Amino acid sequence: MYLYKKNYYGYAESLLDISISENNVEKYINDCFFILSIIQNNQVLILLFKSHFIGKQEKFNIIDKIFSAKIEKILVNFLKVIAKNNLFLYYKQILLKYIKLANSHLSQTWGEIQTAFPISSVMTSSFESILSKKLGKKVHLRHKINSKLISGIRIIVDNQIFENSLFSELKLLKQNLKKHLITKNDL
């Protein structure tokens, strides 16, 4: 397992070197998020690309058909290399490692803003600005609808959670009630 980990980190580092040399790091980050989204929403692609019953050329054709018109050619070829070397099972780790390395290179970070309803890009930009000042680096937020929130927002950046939602208030109330009941039962 360690060998694979070392290999896919090497793939991510190589992709970073290429994106830096092309002065296109930000575009590659966005393309990586696009790839992650497409594959996440079409899990059958993972089975297809890791299958030994489907030929390499057929896999390459599928990659071309899905991604060629939407992402940088280098990234299309990068996906083909991963498929060719039977490492597609690790596509997510490779792309996430690239994003992490690229963000470090650009002195920025990415996070997720979750709401129970759609919000405007102006509001998202406002949160990005506030968090950038608070964290001391450029913050980019991707929006996600989370129906469990009921109302309010949750922002996750660098493993930190900033939350103000009815869901979190109910969760806190439940914990306090449990604590109160346990204390009352101990008397």
Curated annotation (Swiss-Prot):
Membrane topology: Peripheral membrane protein
Highest taxon of source: Bacteria
One Gene Ontology cellular component annotation held by this UniProt entry: proton-transporting ATP synthase complex
Compartments in which it is found: Cell membrane
Keyword GTP-binding: no
Keyword flag Flavoprotein: no
SUPFAM superfamilies, A to Z: N-terminal domain of the delta subunit of the F1F0-ATP synthase (SSF47928)
Keyword field: ATP synthesis, Cell membrane, CF(1), Hydrogen ion transport, Ion transport, Membrane, Transport
Alphabetical list of InterPro entries matching this protein: ATP_synth_OSCP/delta_N_sf, ATPase_OSCP/dsu
Predominant place of localization: membrane
A Pfam family reported for this protein in Swiss-Prot or TrEMBL: OSCP
GO molecular function: proton-transporting ATP synthase activity, rotational mechanism
Function: F(1)F(0) ATP synthase produces ATP from ADP in the presence of a proton or sodium gradient. F-type ATPases consist of two structural domains, F(1) containing the extramembraneous catalytic core and F(0) containing the membrane proton channel, linked together by a central stalk and a peripheral stalk. During catalysis, ATP synthesis in the catalytic domain of F(1) is coupled via a rotary mechanism of the central stalk subunits to proton translocation.
Subunit comment: F-type ATPases have 2 components, F(1) - the catalytic core - and F(0) - the membrane proton channel. F(1) has five subunits: alpha(3), beta(3), gamma(1), delta(1), epsilon(1). F(0) has three main subunits: a(1), b(2) and c(10-14). The alpha and beta chains form an alternating ring which encloses part of the gamma chain. F(1) is attached to F(0) by a central stalk formed by the gamma and epsilon chains, while a peripheral stalk is formed by the delta and b chains.
Protein family membership: Belongs to the ATPase delta chain family.
Protein name as annotated: ATP synthase subunit delta
Organism this protein belongs to: Mesomycoplasma hyopneumoniae (strain 232) (Mycoplasma hyopneumoniae)
